[in-house]
């Protein structure tokens, strides 16, 4: 892919086209690859954790909240 140009003395000048990857493009590909691996790895760990870890325990409901809920429903709280 060499382009030829003729100057005023009819000498032929051959310009070589730069072949290969631009260094900026190499950096972009490397960074994009690391980001892709990071997100794929996180997703794999998330799926693995969902399958293997037990579900979280719910916090116990306080007696005060239970009493308030029963009063809202119209049921008298025990002991009253």
Swiss-Prot record:
- Gene Ontology MF, one: DNA binding
User: Where along the sequence does the record place the motif called Nuclear localization signal?
Assistant: 54-59
Q: Tell me, what is an example of a GO biological process annotation in this record? A: regulation of DNA-templated transcription
Where is it located?
A: Nucleus
Spell out the Basic residues composition-biased ranges: 55-70
The cross-references to InterPro entries, in alphabetical order and at most eight, read: S1FA_DNA-bd
| Keywords assigned by UniProt, alphabetized | DNA-binding, Nucleus, Repressor, Transcription, Transcription regulation
User: What's a single GO CC term here?
Assistant: nucleus
**Chain segments carrying region Disordered:** 55-80
The Swiss-Prot or TrEMBL record describes its family as follows: Belongs to the S1FA transcription factor family.
Q: What does this protein do?
A: DNA-binding protein that specifically recognizes a negative element (S1F) within the RPS1 promoter.
- The molecule here is called DNA-binding protein S1FA2
Q: Which organism is it from?
A: Oryza sativa subsp. japonica
């Amino acid at each position: 892919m060499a382009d030829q140009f003729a100057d005023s003395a009819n000498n032929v000048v051959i310009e070589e086209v730069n072949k290969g990857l631009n260094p900026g493009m190499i950096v972009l590909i490397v960074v994009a690859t690391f980001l892709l691996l990071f997100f794929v790895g996180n997703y794999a760990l998330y799926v693995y954790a969902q399958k293997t870890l037990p579900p979280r325990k719910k916090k116990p409901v306080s007696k005060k909240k239970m009493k308030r809920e029963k009063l809202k429903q119209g049921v008298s709280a025990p002991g009253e």
